[in-house]
A protein has these predicted regions:
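Bacterial N-terminal signal peptides that target proteins for export
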Residues: 1-8
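C-terminal motif of bacterial Sec signal peptides marking the signal peptidase cleavage site
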Residues: 16-19
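Acidic/polar, low-complexity intrinsically disordered N-terminal segments immediately downstream
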Residues: 21-110, 168-191, 283-285, 411-418
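Edge beta-strand at a domain terminus
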Residues: 21-32, 146-189, 197, 262-282, ...
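N-terminal glycine/threonine-rich, aromatic-flanked beta-hairpin/loop signature
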Residues: 62-108, 196-234, 294-341, 389-390
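Long, acidic/polar, low-complexity amphipathic helices and coiled-coil-like
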Residues: 79-225
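An anionic, turn-rich surface loop/hairpin at beta-sheet edges
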Residues: 112-135, 233-248, 342-371
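Acidic, serine/threonine- and glycine-rich low-complexity intrinsically disordered segments
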Residues: 167-314
Length: 418
């Protein structure tokens, strides 16, 4: 295809015209500045005008692919008070955080959370070793503004976000707690989409997005993501699912049947949990074998059906729980970084480490399991981001630094005994 470029020609004028032209430019610049100031003032007043604040549907990742999070925000002209449906290191679900914000004219009218607020900037930072994090934004361009709805676009990643005013009677803590309860109840990883009684496809659930994996005739695998945001009732898709020309957008969570039921008028659809067959194969008793020859017999129990397992034991009198996740892609089990217990009031964390060296405080770290033998079932674990990290370290952080338990889990192997 040929590309056609149109170039504008700048004509020259005589010096005698300079004074007149400068006057015209001054008039134009003043008018442009006035429009910019008016836009800033309008956006600022509308932000402040929602007495009980706004619901910001904050989507992350390129094209919003990682899904949405609910952030409530109230603006007073200088400060913004935020609360969210997720917890961070320093804030619980619904706990308020205050920081500065500004509305200014740059490349259009922009909203910037320019002082640190953990509830927003959490999404804009790398999450650990070789991990880019959620690829979120903290600077946005206003695309449309009204008292009923504000549309923003992230400056860096270009994701479109929607803000709507909260009704005066909305209790922030209650709303966010209700949403968090749905998140907790529905966080299974294997589902199937059923429309008009017919199964359309199997779907994975990865945090706040569904995934559909397909393998073509050459063996090439493609994964499509369908992001959504949790609501007090269930979920709302970022963009509707489309099946045979029918758009499917809103779902209510049925906890008794572990099913998302579509609430769109005239649509018969649901997203129903199913337990992958391979999950059940890992329940049972194991020998936990370490590099130093130590062998501990433990039971791997169901924690969340189809998703996770728990292994419980004690160290120095402290109850410890290792959570293993079922990996449907590899049909094996993985060990993620996690909080495994509490020691003297401090959270005990599992992180990857190097023998005689450092450890990585990487909350996204995963020790991926692989089957080394089938009889008996033997599973070995490797830190996927850096295979030289053969330690699973248990550490806790006090005000004067990090401390670790004397027990180090090196070259961990699980051997099934029943």
């Amino acid at each position: 295809m040929r590309k056609i470029k149109i170039y504008g020609l700048l004509t020259c004028v005589c010096l005698m015209m300079q004074s007149c032209l400068f006057n015209e430019e001054d008039i134009f610049d003043e008018s442009s500045a006035q429009r910019a100031i008016a836009s800033v003032n309008e956006c600022q007043e509308i932000l402040k005008g929602a007495a009980n604040g706004w619901l910001l549907e904050y989507y992350t990742g390129e094209d919003g692919e990682y899904g949405g999070f609910n952030v409530l925000a109230r603006f007073d002209g200088n400060n913004v008070i935020m609360a969210a449906d997720f917890a961070t290191d320093n804030y619980e679900i619904g706990e308020e955080s205050t920081s500065l914000y500004k509305v200014e004219s740059y490349q259009g009218t922009e909203l910037s959370f320019d002082s640190y607020n953990e509830l927003i900037h959490e999404f804009c930072e790398p999450s650990g070793y070789n991990s880019p994090g959620y690829a979120g934004d903290y600077e946005f361009v206003f695309r449309s503004v009204s008292k009923e709805k504000i549309v923003l676009t992230g400056k860096k990643h270009g994701v479109t976000l929607i803000m709507t005013p909260l009704p005066a009677e909305t209790n922030w803590q209650e709303k966010l707690t209700n949403i968090a309860n749905v998140v907790s109840q529905a966080s299974y990883v294997t589902y199937k989409l059923i429309v008009n009684g017919q199964e359309i496809t199997k779907m994975g659930q990865e945090e706040h997005a569904f995934s559909v994996t397909k393998v073509d005739e050459t063996g090439e695998t493609t994964v499509s993501l369908y992001p959504f945001i949790y609501t007090e009732e269930g979920i709302k898709m970022y963009e509707p699912l489309v099946v045979n020309g029918v758009e499917i957008n809103n779902f209510k969570w049925d906890n008794e049947n572990l099913t998302y039921i579509c609430t769109d008028t005239g649509v018969d659809a649901k997203i129903e949990f199913y337990c992958p067959e391979g999950y059940l194969n890992y329940l049972g008793n194991y020998i936990l074998q370490l590099a130093n020859g130590q062998r501990i017999q433990l039971e791997l129990k169901q924690k969340m059906i189809g998703k996770s397992f728990a292994m419980n034991f004690a160290l120095s009198g402290t109850p410890i729980e290792f959570v293993y996740n079922y990996n449907m892609t590899t049909d094996c089990i993985d060990v993620p970084s996690q909080t495994v217990g509490v020691y003297q009031g401090y959270n005990v964390l599992l992180y990857p480490g190097i023998p005689g060296g450092n450890f990585y405080a990487d909350d996204s770290a995963v020790f991926q399991g692989r089957i080394a033998n089938t009889d008996p079932l033997t599973i070995k674990f490797t830190y996927v981001n850096n295979p030289i990290c053969t330690l699973m370290l248990l550490v806790y952080q006090k005000t004067d630094g990090w401390y670790g338990f004397s027990t180090m889990f090196q070259d961990v192997t699980l051997i099934k005994v029943d």
